Design a protein with these regions (language model features):
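Short sequence/structural elements of tandem HEAT/ARM alpha-solenoid repeats
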Residues: 194-201, 236-240
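Interaction-prone helical segments in low-complexity regions
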Residues: 185-191
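"A position-specific structural signal for the A-helix of alpha-solenoid helical repeats
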Residues: 119, 123, 178-182, 217-224, ...
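Internal alpha-helical scaffold/solenoid segments in large eukaryotic proteins
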Residues: 177-181, 205, 212-231, 235-247
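Alpha-helical solenoid cores of large eukaryotic proteins
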Residues: 123-130, 156, 182-183
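Charged, E/D/K/R/S-rich low-complexity terminal regions of large eukaryotic assembly subunits
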Residues: 1-115, 135-136, 150-158, 162-173, ...
Length: 436
């Protein structure tokens, strides 16, 4: 069996080859078919096609229901090629429904068709996203599109889940991870994090499902696990997931590696790890350099500018909630700088107040040791805000310290004044309503 992608001169040649592979009746042949069902493949032979001829040719090479399924597939490809996304989306919905009812539910103890079942689901997600873009800012319509796609794929997922067996040789479970990735992509867009979490927990309890999956599906799955860990504020677990994904993406796919790095880099920053400038330059991610420089310098003003100018980028990644926690890292850094300059575990609050104030004005605290001699006029509101910041740093365990109101000092613990960031606790703004 050849693994390369073939070009076809006609509908007849395409369907004849798919039919020959299908007669092999193994998942390897199924995977070969899958490669030729993606929208990324060349379907130049469709430019002069007649709808009637596809139906007739499909009946020559396939028995029911596959004649109907591949006929629909080529119709969808045509709609996609000519940007008729609404027609394509609704036709693809019917295709996936038909595959579920006439193949998954009917053909028992076989799984050779699962690879292209998964590809049909991926195609549905692609069309859902394209159609959603056409909906502009109509959030009700966009949600309806994603929900409709998710509901159809979920039915396939549940049926395969019910086919879970001790030996996966003939089980439909081999498609679970790929179907889960489709669901997670839609659930994240819908904000249905609990549904996504439920699917991922099922895979975690059945590790063999991960082991038997293709590398590409493993990478996508780990990315979704990483995003879910970020929402739970578990940076260590998120780092492990994104690192796995990055290591398993070949270097010839720089675009995919760049997407993963957009998640891995901020995750690493919250663990106290600064990316090299070379890495940022290689993948055109220098906007992260603004954050790392500001944090290193203890410059709140510079950090605020970085947050403001890159808010949209973080929002597109679905991690804008991380922006709320960057100031805490910077204030922690300032406390550490001041403690080193003072050379004592007991720091007068006026020194910290002065450092915080200068930082908000754009001064690099790390390179301005003379702030101890700077006189700043006290402002009641700013002093109260300063106190709140310190209390939050202590409450979140960013620093192990206490405030002495008797002599207006911050008293750092003798043991670990600045705990590892992996041990620090944060409050995710997304879950405030649940905690209230």
């Amino acid at each position: 069996m050849r693994n390369k992608i073939l070009d076809f001169s006609s509908v007849k040649a395409f369907l004849r080859q798919i039919s020959e592979w299908g007669q092999g009746g193994t998942t390897e042949y199924g995977k070969q078919i899958k490669k030729h069902l993606s929208f990324q493949r060349e379907y130049s032979f469709l430019h002069n096609y007649e709808e009637v001829s596809i139906d007739a040719v499909a009946k020559q090479y396939f028995h029911n229901p596959f004649d109907y399924i591949f006929n629909m597939h080529l119709n969808v490809v045509f709609f996609h090629a000519f940007k008729s996304y609404s027609n394509g989306f609704h036709q693809q919905l019917e295709l996936v429904k038909a595959f579920n009812s006439t193949v998954l539910q009917v053909i028992k103890n076989e799984n050779w068709f699962m690879p292209f079942c998964c590809q049909f689901s991926k195609n549905l997600v692609v069309l859902a996203k394209l159609l959603a873009r056409r909906a502009s800012n109509d959030q009700v319509k966009i949600k309806a599109i994603f929900q409709e796609a998710a509901d159809v794929i979920l039915q396939c997922y549940k049926l395969c889940q019910a086919d879970l067996q001790t030996h996966a040789m003939n089980s439909k479970e081999i498609g679970l991870l790929s179907l889960l990735n489709c669901l997670c992509e839609l659930y994240f867009k819908l904000g249905q994090i609990d549904d996504c979490n439920e699917c991922i927990e099922f895979i975690m309890k059945n590790n063999s499902l991960f082991d038997i999956a293709d590398n590409a599906d493993k990478v996508k799955y780990k990315c979704y696990c990483g995003q879910l860990s970020l929402l739970k504020w578990n940076f260590k677990e998120a780092e492990e997931c994104f690192t796995f994904a990055l290591k398993h993406v070949p270097e010839q796919y720089p675009r995919v590696r760049k997407i993963i790095l957009k998640y891995l880099i901020p995750t690493g920053i919250f663990l106290g790890k600064v990316p090299s400038k070379k890495l940022l330059e290689t993948y055109d991610l220098m906007f992260f350099h603004e954050f790392t420089v500001a944090l290193k310098n203890g410059n709140i003003c510079q950090l605020s500018n970085a947050i403001e100018s890159n808010g949209i980028t973080f929002a597109r990644l679905g991690i804008s909630f991380l922006l709320h926690a960057f100031p805490s890292l910077c204030y922690r850094r300032i406390v550490r700088i001041v403690a080193r300059i003072v050379g004592s575990k007991i720091i007068p609050l006026r020194y910290l107040y002065c450092a915080f104030a200068l930082s908000t004005e754009g001064v690099n605290v790390v390179s301005f040791p003379n702030f101890l001699m700077t006189n700043i006029v006290d402002n009641c509101d700013k002093w109260n805000e300063f106190h709140c910041i310190l209390i939050n740093l202590i409450a979140k365990k960013n620093i192990n310290a206490s405030i002495s109101t008797a002599d207006n000092t911050l008293v750092l613990n003798d043991s670990t004044s600045f705990p590892s960031l992996t041990e620090a606790t944060y409050t995710n703004p997304l879950f405030l309503e649940e905690l209230a």
